[in-house]
Regions:
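Active-site helix/loop of acyl-thioester processing domains in fatty-acid/polyketide metabolism
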Residues: 52-77
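Hydrophobic residues on conserved beta-strands that form the core of alpha/beta folds
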Residues: 22-23, 88, 118, 132
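Catalytic strand-loop segment that frames the active site of acyl-thioester-processing enzymes
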Residues: 16-52
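Hydrophobic beta-strand-centered segment that forms part of the acyl-chain substrate-binding groove
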Residues: 2-3, 68-104
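Conserved positions in beta-strands of structured domains
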Residues: 23-26, 94, 108-110
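Short aromatic-glycine motifs in intrinsically disordered, low-complexity regions
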Residues: 6-16
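HotDog/MaoC-like acyl-thioester-processing domains
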Residues: 34, 98-101, 108-147
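Hydrophobic core residues within well-ordered beta-strands of beta-rich domains
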Residues: 19-21, 103, 117
Length: 147
């Protein structure tokens, strides 16, 4: 069993700083994946004292990608590949978080058809639900650089 929070996120994601919006994988099972991300004081998508919509969407997509990366590396023992956002549907943002807040995100697996995967994503700050979406991602054959 892997201690999820000890896994360097770079092992699971193709993105590299400053474009990484997941700090830790908190949990994985076949149905649910959880991640966390502390909003930085400054950086990409921090605008006017808030984490912008684009950042929330990218965080949700990267949380979904962390699930796929974990499965590849630790379940199937194959190289992690680059994926792409196919669509974001039913996006609802209830509040934009501020620097210093920690996002805790739950990715619920819905279905996979060939290399297309559908997930539902919920983003929380503490007990407060701040964003939801359904995200469709597509896999590729391009392997990420080993971290």
């Amino acid at each position: 069993m892997t201690a999820f929070d000890q896994i360097p996120i770079e092992y699971l994601l193709p993105q590299r700083p400053p474009f990484v919006f997941v700090d830790h994988l908190l949990h994985y099972d076949e149905a649910i994946t959880r991640t966390s991300f502390r909003i930085p004081e400054q950086g990409v998508f921090v605008e006017n004292g808030h984490f912008a919509t684009g950042g929330l969407v990218e965080h949700m997509a990267q949380s979904s990608a962390a699930r796929v990366g974990y499965i590849a590396r630790y379940v199937l023992h194959i190289p992690v590949t680059i994926g792409y956002i196919g669509s974001v549907r039913k996006l609802r943002i209830f509040r934009h978080p501020v620097p210093g807040e920690v996002l805790e995100t739950t990715v619920t697996f819905r279905e996979k058809i060939f290399e297309i995967e559908l997930t539902d994503v919920e983003v929380r700050c503490g007990d407060e639900l701040i964003a939801t979406a359904s995200i469709k991602t597509a896999g590729s054959d391009k392997v990420i650089d080993e971290a």
